[in-house]
């Protein structure tokens, strides 16, 4: 049988099962309300398993503990069914002595995936399993589509992403990944608020896309009759708030970048950005190390983070190395003279595979070389510092070397996880850098920034010395859950429509 014939046979089988389940639903409708909403549970499956884990069969029988549970049927073995709620699973026992004939007849028609409500008392089987000996049970929701085969699950990766709701039903590991994601975000929020940061919300629709070097999504505001952009970063609005007197702010929200899709990139992604006045980028490095250690300990119970065949050590001091020095360290065949000669640097960048357009300055070329020859080699946590000013239009120049900025990017496993710098608060310097970005855009750089006159005006009122940082939540969760693709940690990643 060919793959096409097999697919057709499986589809026909599924269609027949759906038709049978629809007949059962029609019978439920004929009885009255087929989708009741008057049941209130008083227990979760996992809580019961934990609370009564040490109770013996005899102790449970004597206590006769009443419970109300609800969940989806995941296994049906006649006398015993296994139901699943958001916390876990528990068995329920179909007791012919305590259930009515009508109920027993109804139970026989139920299918895997149906959602039921059960009342009864806790008991323990001869094998030691906790279960609910039901005194009443009823159907709450009829499932019309059969779940994937229990032995094989939902294994097609694309279908898992397209039908995440099914993926979540049948795969506990997937549910745990998204529980961890929620934990991570909650802890980040708590971590910052304990340090007097104020959570804020800034516009998702912007008239000028700014705060990052990226290509935006464009849209049209009908009421105002104007072009607008989905934000690529909230940075410029958050710094306006620092100007306004909110000296410590953060936002956890979506950014949108109209760029490629890969295991590390999704056009819609979640970012933490935070800003604190009277601090610099080195303060942010210390804060970031502390946060990452806490998150690893919270999720894994250890500061050693396994990822694939590697282990990242969050408990050790993160390496701190400049862009320039990192190129020389990981490429000993290159010299400082090579990197400081624009013609040689251009040739090295081209040979390494960078897309050199011809208008790049020396600093831009050095970063291109770093991205091609160094980035993927940074396995253990590295703070890469002192990015050239021409690729850091919003960062403060370094006091000792004005050709570079007080900036770092954090790399773990060869991936950028965070980007931070001491913020540029010189309004005149900012205006000049915006003009340089406009020139780059005119020369063909789609990712160069626009000129934002209102942001320059805000700086003219005076912004205190400030440090800011952005951390990619999705990539961070990938690390902490050992997930190989960014799509594994986004509930509904972007997919092409099915034909």
UniProtKB/Swiss-Prot annotation:
EC numbers, comma separated: 6.1.1.6
Cross-referenced Pfam families: tRNA-synt_2 (PF00152), tRNA_anti-codon (PF01336)
Biological processes per GO annotation: lysyl-tRNA aminoacylation
Required co-factors: Mg(2+)
Main subcellular location of this protein, as a coarse class: cytoplasm
Family that this chain belongs to: Belongs to the class-II aminoacyl-tRNA synthetase family.
Name of the protein in question: Lysine--tRNA ligase
Lineage: Bacteria, Pseudomonadati, Pseudomonadota, Gammaproteobacteria, Pseudomonadales
Gene transcribed to yield this protein: lysS
